[in-house]
């Protein structure tokens, strides 16, 4: 695949993730957009690693590390969201003012 096509796809995914983070009012949707951002960065790492030096696996290993961190982040984030929902009965970002109570 051509490098420019993959970079355009990654930029498109990144911009969708940024747009989703800015406009999202739901915490679960915001977590999904954050995962989309991380996956677009992983796509860039793997693409540049393969394009510049396909014998070294630095980009691939770094992508696997980011995937592991993202999985832990998603697990902790969903646990926090479920706890907030249990206490507040809402997962909307603008309704959960956690510093007041």
From Swiss-Prot:
It is a multi-pass membrane protein. This is NAD(P)H-quinone oxidoreductase subunit 4L, chloroplastic. Its main location: plastid. Its EC number is 7.1.1.-. GO terms for biological process: ATP synthesis coupled electron transport; photosynthesis, light reaction. It catalyses: a plastoquinone + NADH + (n+1) H(+)(in) = a plastoquinol + NAD(+) + n H(+)(out); a plastoquinone + NADPH + (n+1) H(+)(in) = a plastoquinol + NADP(+) + n H(+)(out). It is an enzyme of class 7 (translocase). NDH shuttles electrons from NAD(P)H:plastoquinone, via FMN and iron-sulfur (Fe-S) centers, to quinones in the photosynthetic chain and possibly in a chloroplast respiratory chain. The immediate electron acceptor for the enzyme in this species is believed to be plastoquinone. Couples the redox reaction to proton translocation, and thus conserves the redox energy in a proton gradient. Belongs to the complex I subunit 4L family. GO terms for cellular component: chloroplast thylakoid membrane; NADH dehydrogenase complex. NDH is composed of at least 16 different subunits, 5 of which are encoded in the nucleus. The chain crosses the membrane at residues 2-22, 30-52, 61-81. HAMAP family: NDH1_NuoK. The lineage of its organism: Eukaryota, Viridiplantae, Streptophyta, Embryophyta, Tracheophyta. Keywords: Chloroplast, Membrane, NAD, NADP, Plastid, Plastoquinone, Quinone, Thylakoid, Translocase, Transmembrane, Transmembrane helix, Transport. One of its GO terms (molecular function) is quinone binding. It is found in: Plastid, Chloroplast thylakoid membrane.
């Amino acid at each position: 695949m051509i490098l420019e096509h993959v970079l355009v796809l990654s930029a498109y995914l990144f911009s969708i993730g940024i747009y989703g983070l800015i406009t999202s009012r739901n915490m679960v949707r915001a977590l999904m957009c954050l995962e989309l951002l991380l996956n677009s960065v992983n796509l860039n790492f793997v693409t540049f690693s393969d394009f510049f030096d396909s014998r070294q696996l630095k980009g691939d290993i770094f992508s696997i590390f980011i995937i592991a961190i993202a999985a832990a982040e998603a697990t902790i984030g969903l646990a926090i969201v479920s706890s907030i929902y249990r206490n507040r009965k809402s997962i909307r970002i603008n309704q959960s003012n956690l510093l007041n109570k």
